[in-house]
């Protein structure tokens, strides 16, 4: 059955609506050209998620065992969701909230995704602060994390291998003496060296520098998280100043910056890759990363982590893709862009993974450790421990490579957070048309800076883990399920495919139809249910959070997930049509605002939809298979 917008349709109202949509279209800026859109999508999807999060996620899930589930998830969930969000943004020329004129009762999905995006922004900026800090100290005559201080117990220099080997030999010969010092806070971290039946805990100087000099990590936050570090606070402030300058003029400024944000990181990443694969032991690390462990394919946790990483890397379910696509021309060829970005994202993740595991292989070789998993703990500190450690081993001007690397990380982070921040600014500006874009950008940037202060405290990494787990991961996950259900199951796959055909002038393939209607939602639902049933109290650095932390985490998740039903009820209460049940049913139909923003294009679309409905009516009458034929065509969204 063809869905029709609800509400009155008299000529006067139609004329007024046409004028409003035309005015809205005129007010909305478009990209300078299609390449700016592509570069912007690359800058957000090919970001810290590839260089920072993908390697340590693969590390936590057995290296190569993670690659097969990740690639399968990419094709059955990642690509379909990415393409769907691109279509929604370009078709409506609206942001994350306004697109829900397709199914007004689901408007809470947009607000919930905005909440999840704010959570991600809050800690993402702290990562930028860390990269800036490392960038600044890289200009010293000797990299400060490359050598051990006198008061650093059981420390191994991150200098070239010949120095490290001599140090380990000395440690091994005096293991009994060092064993008495294992009561220090460092004994819970690092790697072990077995000699004379005594286990000596070793740490690279890069790890100690990060944990005890930079973030001044607390191993227990039961007494609080401490005060913000003033150096990291200044770095955080500088990061937000840059973010504001990039987004202050909307796509006019961010589109131009996207060329640099998208392309420069690849130059540095290739340089680091070449250096990493030439290090001793790199081969073992790469083999560990690429060699699949087939038994892990049956581990549901690995599949759940693959979905989470796919969402994080592609920025699916948090709004940037919809927001970017909303600034496109209606006839822009987004299919090509979607395929380019999703493919490039995967290749970059593999490139980043090979680079980091080559470095881990070298680290294991220098520390005489057989199991690469024992080299360094995983987590957010991986990029600030293993990468700096490798850079310290560069024979020629390591300071130069360090500056290039951390500048690359900063550029990657800026590209990601600019997209996330622009999503929030676009939502606010779409809701309140009278507000100046730059003022909203300034206000949200100030709020982002204040929220980021929590993460530059000694207990900040604990809070980052908590917010990422409850506010970023699970909120985005569950709302993505509702997003797909509202578009494909409520609005209807057949209607959606017709809209794509009208906009892109191409039929939707069976691959997309099967993924959207069955494989993608079913896999997401199964994985989400499993993850909720088997969920355990989260840990940081192998330590459990205090009870108050878990309560705060579930409260964070509850606030994000509750946006969906609460805003749905709000819409129903504001648009009553008869009984409560009738109002709910009406809220699940497209509103008058659904469709292309341009009035002329919208009229053409309505004619196209009417013609499609007439064609299907004729086909149903002529079909000999009757009921079953109609079910097949409705399921596939195709005029077979």
Curated annotation (Swiss-Prot):
Question: Which PROSITE patterns does the entry mention?
Answer: NA_NEUROTRAN_SYMP_1 (PS00610), NA_NEUROTRAN_SYMP_3 (PS50267)
Q: Where is the composition biased (Low complexity)?
A: 1-13
Name the CDD domains for this protein.
SLC6sbd
The membrane topology of this protein is: Multi-pass membrane protein
Q: Which residues form a coiled coil?
A: none
Q: Which residues cross the membrane?
A: 31-51, 64-84, 117-137, 228-248, 257-277, 306-326, 340-360, 400-420, 447-467, 473-493, 515-535, 551-571
Record's signal peptide: none
In which domain of life is the source organism classified? Eukaryota
Q: Which GO terms describe its biological process?
A: amino acid import across plasma membrane; D-amino acid transport; neutral amino acid transport; sodium ion transport
List the glycosylation sites.
Answer: 174, 181, 197
Q: Which GO terms describe its molecular function?
A: amino acid:sodium symporter activity; D-amino acid transmembrane transporter activity; L-amino acid transmembrane transporter activity; neutral L-amino acid transmembrane transporter activity
Do you know which InterPro entries this protein is assigned to?
Answer: Na/ntran_symport (IPR000175), SNS_sf (IPR037272)
Q: Does the keyword Protein biosynthesis apply?
A: no
Q: Please indicate the ranges of residues that lie on the Cytoplasmic side.
A: 1-30
Family membership: Belongs to the sodium:neurotransmitter symporter (SNF) (TC 2.A.22) family.
Role summary: Unusual broad substrate spectrum amino acid:sodium cotransporter that promotes absorption of the D isomers of essential amino acids. Neutral amino acids are the preferred substrates, especially methionine and phenylalanine.
Protein name per Swiss-Prot or TrEMBL: Sodium-dependent nutrient amino acid transporter 1
Q: What is the lineage of its organism?
A: Eukaryota, Metazoa, Ecdysozoa, Arthropoda, Hexapoda
Gene that encodes the chain: NAAT1
């Amino acid at each position: 059955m063809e869905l029709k917008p609800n509400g009155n349709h008299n000529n006067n109202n139609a004329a007024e609506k046409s004028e409003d949509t035309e005015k809205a279209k005129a007010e909305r800026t478009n990209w300078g050209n299609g390449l700016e859109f592509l570069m912007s999508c690359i800058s957000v999807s090919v970001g810290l998620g590839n260089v920072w999060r993908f390697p340590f996620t693969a590390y936590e899930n057995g290296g190569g065992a993670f690659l097969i589930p990740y690639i399968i998830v990419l094709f059955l969930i990642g690509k379909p969701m990415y393409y769907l969000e691109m279509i929604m943004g370009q078709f409506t020329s609206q942001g994350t909230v306004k697109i829900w004129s397709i199914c007004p009762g689901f408007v809470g999905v947009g607000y919930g995704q905005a909440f999840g995006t704010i959570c991600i922004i809050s800690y993402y900026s702290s990562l930028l602060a860390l990269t800036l800090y490392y960038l600044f100290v890289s200009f010293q005559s000797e990299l400060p994390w490359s050598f051990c201080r006198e008061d650093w117990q059981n420390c191994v220099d991150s200098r070239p291998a010949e120095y490290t080997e001599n140090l380990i030999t000395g440690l091994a010969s005096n293991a009994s003496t060092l064993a008495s010092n294992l009561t220090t806070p460092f004994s819970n971290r690092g790697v072990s060296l077995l000699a004379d039946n005594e286990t000596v805990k070793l740490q690279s100087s890069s790890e100690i520098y990060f944990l005890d000099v930079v973030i001044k990590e607390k191993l227990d936050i039961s007494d609080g998280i401490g005060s913000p570090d003033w150096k990291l606070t200044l770095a955080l402030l500088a990061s937000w100043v840059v973010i504001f300058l990039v987004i202050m003029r909307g796509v006019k400024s961010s589109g131009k910056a996207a060329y640099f944000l998208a392309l420069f990181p690849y130059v540095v990443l290739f340089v680091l890759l070449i250096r990493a694969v030439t290090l001793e032991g790199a081969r073992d690390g790469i083999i560990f990363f690429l060699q699949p462990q087939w038994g892990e394919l049956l581990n549901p946790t690995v599949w759940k982590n693959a979905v989470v990483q796919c969402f994080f890397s592609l920025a699916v379910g948090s709004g940037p893709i919809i927001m970017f696509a909303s600034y496109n021309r209606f006839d822009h060829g987004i299919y090509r862009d979607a395929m380019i970005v999703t493919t490039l994202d995967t290749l970059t993740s593999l490139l980043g993974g090979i680079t980091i595991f080559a470095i881990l292989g070298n680290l294991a070789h220098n520390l005489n450790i057989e199991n690469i998993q024992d080299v360094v703990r995983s987590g957010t500190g991986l990029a600030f421990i293993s990468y700096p450690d490798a850079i310290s081993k560069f024979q020629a001007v390591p300071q130069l490579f360090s500056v290039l690397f951390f500048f690359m990380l900063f550029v990657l982070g800026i590209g990601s957070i600019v997209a996330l921040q622009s999503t929030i600014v676009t939502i606010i500006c779409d809701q309140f048309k009278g507000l100046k874009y730059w003022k909203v950008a300034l206000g949200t940037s100030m709020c982002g800076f204040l929220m980021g202060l929590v993460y530059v405290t000694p207990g900040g990494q604990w809070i980052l883990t908590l917010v990422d787990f409850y506010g970023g991961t699970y909120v985005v996950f569950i709302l993505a399920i509702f997003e797909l259900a509202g578009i494909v199951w409520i609005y209807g796959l057949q209607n959606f495919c017709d809209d794509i055909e009208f906009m892109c002038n191409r039929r939707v393939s069976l691959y997309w139809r099967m993924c959207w209607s069955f494989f993608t939602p079913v896999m997401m639902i199964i994985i989400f249910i499993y993850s909720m049933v088997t969920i355990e109290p989260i840990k940081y650095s192998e330590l459990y959070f205090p009870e108050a932390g878990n309560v705060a985490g579930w409260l964070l998740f509850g606030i994000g997930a509750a946006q969906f039903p609460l805003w749905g009820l709000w819409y129903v209460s504001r648009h009553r049509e008869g009984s409560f049940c009738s109002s709910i049913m009406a809220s699940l139909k497209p509103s008058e605002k659904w469709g292309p923003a341009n009035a002329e294009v919208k009229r053409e679309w309505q004619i196209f939809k009417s013609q499609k409905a007439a064609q299907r009516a004729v086909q149903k009458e002529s079909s000999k298979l009757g009921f079953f034929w109609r079910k097949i065509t409705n399921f596939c969204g195709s005029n077979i």
